[in-house]
């Protein structure tokens, strides 16, 4: 009789584990500690002078399975990260001198998330001086990150989401560390 009582609980847990969980922008943005490290190295030409164009690529998460990264979530993470290091202006006016264009090219995930989940991402970044139209920076940044089984025991989709967010946070961190080396 006790076993019969466990069946509805097990069914509920399996249904909840099957729901799609989209990646969120804030966990993809760089941490305050990373922002503090980078902020001191930002060239004067980039301080409050980098805007973000509409991000291309990305995919909405399905209702029942998986975890994807939408273009809007990546754009919000980029804007938050640029703001944290002092590159993004506080208001849209006056218009910033530079425009960062980003395209999510690749999101490699396992078909069936197992014990540990490793996700690979590739994002193409282009920084354009809007006054001259000159490309100041262009690079495809690819990296991987993972989420362990212990971080989301019940939900494989939650592990995918965690790995997505970590991989993109590391990707944005690499971008910002590249940008502070430029002298436009």
Residues of each region from the PLM?
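Surface-exposed short loop/turn segments
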Residues: 20-29, 85, 89-138, 145-158
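Short alpha-helical interface patches
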Residues: 71-83, 95
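Short, intrinsically disordered/low-complexity patches at protein termini
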Residues: 46-49, 123-125, 159-162
């Amino acid at each position: 009789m006790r076993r019969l009582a466990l069946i509805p609980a097990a069914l509920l847990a399996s249904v909840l584990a099957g729901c799609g969980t989209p990646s969120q922008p804030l966990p993809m943005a760089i941490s305050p500690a990373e922002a503090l490290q980078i902020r001191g190295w930002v060239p004067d030409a980039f301080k409050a002078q980098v805007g973000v164009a509409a991000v291309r690529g990305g995919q909405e998460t399905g209702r029942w399975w998986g975890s994807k990264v939408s273009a809007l979530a990546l754009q919000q993470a980029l804007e938050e990260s640029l703001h944290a290091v002092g590159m993004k202006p506080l208001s849209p006016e006056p218009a910033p001198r530079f425009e960062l264009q980003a395209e999510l090219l690749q999101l490699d995930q396992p078909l069936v998330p197992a014990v540990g989940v490793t996700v690979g991402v590739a994002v193409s970044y282009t920084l354009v001086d809007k006054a001259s139209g000159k490309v100041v920076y262009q690079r495809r940044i690819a990296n991987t990150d993972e989420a362990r089984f212990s971080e989301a025991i019940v939900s494989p989709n939650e592990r995918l989401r965690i790995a997505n967010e970590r991989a993109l946070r590391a990707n944005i961190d690499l971008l910002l560390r590249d940008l502070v080396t430029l002298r436009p």
